[in-house]
């Protein structure tokens, strides 16, 4: 994990002496290289969830070292024993892609986190979370772009955004200020950076998913 951005970079392999793929490259690549060496694996590709700097900062180093292609679009691939599906999940960014590996794990980039979702276009984020991720099995591991992993089932049960979007909980009604604009706080959740995440509706009817540091309670 990169200590300033708290961004994750991953490497997975089908077996020792087999095939490996990287997922994002925003963190120091030394642990990834060490893992590949320990496994005696042959890298086949870099899977890029999106092109924000905190996810690609060290991508050029991996490409220079291993001369492998970057995969950054939806599709299906098979490398050795690794079966990978790329799913379009726009919202946090237009180019966001999640990668499902077999029936075991999904790399969600900055769309779905432990207890939170990514900031961005609310309608697109909601569709990506509810129509794509919540269609996956409950026991599937969620490996996000930042900090701790979770599972689809846990987020279905406990993620405040998912609970409201699924109808399990009502939208909030608290009045707040967001950057000098009056708004209603529809959802509040913890977030990986410790500042929280909020879905708000402004008085003109527009919505936004914003970092919690931008939200001021009216009573404060």
Indicate residue ranges for each PLM-predicted region.
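Active-site metal-binding motif and surrounding structural segment of the metallo-beta-lactamase
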Residues: 29-73
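Conserved beta-strand hairpin/beta-sheet module of binuclear metal-dependent hydrolase folds
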Residues: 1-39, 98-109, 115
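Short active-site oxyanion
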Residues: 18-21, 42-45, 68, 139-140
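Glycine-rich phosphate-binding loop signature in dinucleotide/nucleotide-binding domains
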Residues: 38-42, 79-82, 136
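Histidine-centered catalytic micro-motifs
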Residues: 46-56, 87-96, 142-150
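Core dinuclear metal-dependent hydrolase active-site scaffold
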Residues: 11, 76-101, 106
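A short acidic, helix-capping loop that chelates divalent metal ions and anchors anionic groups
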Residues: 57, 115-120
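Accessory terminal helices/loops
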Residues: 127-141, 147-220
């Amino acid at each position: 994990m990169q200590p300033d951005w708290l961004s994750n970079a991953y490497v997975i392999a089908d077996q020792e002496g087999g095939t490996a793929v990287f997922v994002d490259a925003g963190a120091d690549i030394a642990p990834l290289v060490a893992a590949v060496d320990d496994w005696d694996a042959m890298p086949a590709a870099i899977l890029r969830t999106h092109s924000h700097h905190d996810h690609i900062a060290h991508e050029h180093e991996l490409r220079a070292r291993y001369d492998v292609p970057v995969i950054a679009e939806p599709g299906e691939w098979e490398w050795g024993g690794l079966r990978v599906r790329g799913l379009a999940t726009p919202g946090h960014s237009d180019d966001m892609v999640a990668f499902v590996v077999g029936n075991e794990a999904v790399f969600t980039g900055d769309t779905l986190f432990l207890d939170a979702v990514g900031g961005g276009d609310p309608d697109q984020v909601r569709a990506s979370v509810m129509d794509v991720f919540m269609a996956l099995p409950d026991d599937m591991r969620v490996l996000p772009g930042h900090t701790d992993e979770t599972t689809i089932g846990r987020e279905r049960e406990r993620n405040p955004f998912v609970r409201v979007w699924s109808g399990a909980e009502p939208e909030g009604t608290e009045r707040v200020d967001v950057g000098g604009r009056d708004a209603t706080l529809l959802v509040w959740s913890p977030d990986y950076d410790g500042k929280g995440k909020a879905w708000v509706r402004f008085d003109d009817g527009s919505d936004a998913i914003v970092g919690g540091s931008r939200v001021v309670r009216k009573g404060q």
